[in-house]
A protein has these predicted regions:
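RNase H-like, Mg2+-dependent phosphodiesterase core
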Residues: 1-198
Length: 198
């Protein structure tokens, strides 16, 4: 992983390039999170990689390192009600836009993980598997995942029967069994449960 995507954007004349990624599109419960991160070009952060390939402990450590070293960052989310109202894709776009809007300093070019460009106030590009190719996107994936995981741990205390601390809302066997036994709670995505609960 290197800064080639960021570097290309700077060569085009852009002055502030950030990476944006999401966490939590697939779970049956809880919000979808996104983060936007503007790193100093060339900054080396050991072990920076796609958040899904890192242990929870490593992600937590990198979360602080990224926030301390970023030129600017922003975190945003869309909750389960918004996901049910506008669908998960649009809710993900909303979370990404909120993350961008929450940055301490504005960027003028965005690198988005995936193959679909959300509506953004500035130009940018999509990068498939960007969280494994761009340090800015990798950093964003970590901020988004850790932020969402922390929220799900709080929900685990509120709704202990679902064991959100174990699966963070994903459709594991334990989670699906709890849904059949107890039914959904207020943070479940109703549109995601139709196939499971009928």
């Amino acid at each position: 992983m290197d800064y080639s995507f960021e570097h290309e954007a700077y060569l085009k004349g852009y002055t502030a390039v950030c990476g944006i990624d999401e966490a939590g599109r697939g779970p049956l419960a809880g919000p979808v999170y996104a983060a936007a991160v503007w790193l100093p070009e060339g900054l080396v952060i050991d072990s920076l990689n796609d958040s899904k390939k890192l242990s929870e402990k490593k992600r937590e450590a990198l979360f602080d390192v990224i926030k301390e070293n970023a030129v600017a960052y922003g975190i945003g989310f869309a909750d389960e009600k918004e996901i049910d109202e506008i669908n998960i894709l649009q809710a993900t776009y909303l979370a990404m836009r909120r993350a961008y809007d929450n940055m301490q300093k504005a960027c003028d070019y965005v690198l988005i993980d995936g193959n679909r460009m959300p509506p953004m106030p500035v130009p940018g590009e999509t990068i498939v598997k960007g969280d494994a190719k761009s340090p800015s996107i990798a950093a964003a994936s970590i901020l988004a995942k850790v932020s969402r995981d922390r929220v799900m741990l709080e929900y685990a205390k509120q709704y202990p029967v679902y064991h959100f601390e174990k699966h963070k809302g994903y459709g594991t066997k334990v989670h699906v069994e709890a849904l059949h036994e107890f039914g959904p709670c207020p943070i479940h995505r109703k549109t995601f449960l139709k196939k499971i609960l009928g």
